[in-house]
Amino acid sequence: TSIDDGDHPEHEDFRHGTHLAGAVICDLFDGIEGRGVASSSQLIFQDVVNESGWSEPEIDWLLAEDLAYGAVIHSYSWGDVTEAYTSRSFLLDAWHREVPWSLAFIAPGNNPSKLYEPANARNIVSVGGTMKDNGTDLYTGSSHGPTEEGLRGNFIVTPAVGIVSAAADGNLSSFNSDMRSST
């Protein structure tokens, strides 16, 4: 899915999805060290940022597209800055009741005392971040909740600082193989 023609260097969220996708599925290339947590997996890339900002389609539309291509694991690192249980949270919960063999991993945001939607859905895995050199300390910007209802926040945490992963260059025909380090 693409709402436009790819990453736009003019937007502040340029490269975000590419970097996260690389952290999940990257494999070694031309001697570059690094491997994603599910290296050699296949990817359905759903571009939800255009030159004006976020413009994501309805979550049920994205999930239906995933199902049509056989994807059962979902990774979302976006949402709205609200702790409310939204229609998107509800649709994710409904989806996972109807398609119980699928699972979504969702970043809860960048405010430690909050847990933003859709990571507050009840049938997903909320993923917080730790410092890279010490897996027991949460990254200072990692959301962890609790939820608006007072429920626990993250299900799991993963290193979130200094991650070397894929780098977008904004050129659709470059066959870019660059890497970058980021949070």
What are these regions (language model features)?
Residues 55-64:
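Short, acidic/polar
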Residues 17, 59-60, 88-92, 138:
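Amphipathic alpha-helical segments in well-structured domains
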Residues 6, 132-138, 160-183:
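The feature captures the short pre-catalytic strand/loop hairpin that immediately precedes
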Residues 25-29, 67, 93-100, 129-132, ...:
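Sec-exported extracytoplasmic/periplasmic mature domains
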Residues 63-89, 106-108:
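Short acidic, glycine-rich surface-loop motifs adjacent to enzyme active sites
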Residues 1-56, 72, 82-85, 99-101, ...:
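Subtilisin-like serine protease catalytic core
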Residues 76, 104-108, 129, 158, ...:
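General beta-strand structural signal in soluble alpha/beta enzymes
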Residues 79-81, 107-113, 132-133, 162:
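Catalytic metal-binding/acid-base residues of hydrolase active sites
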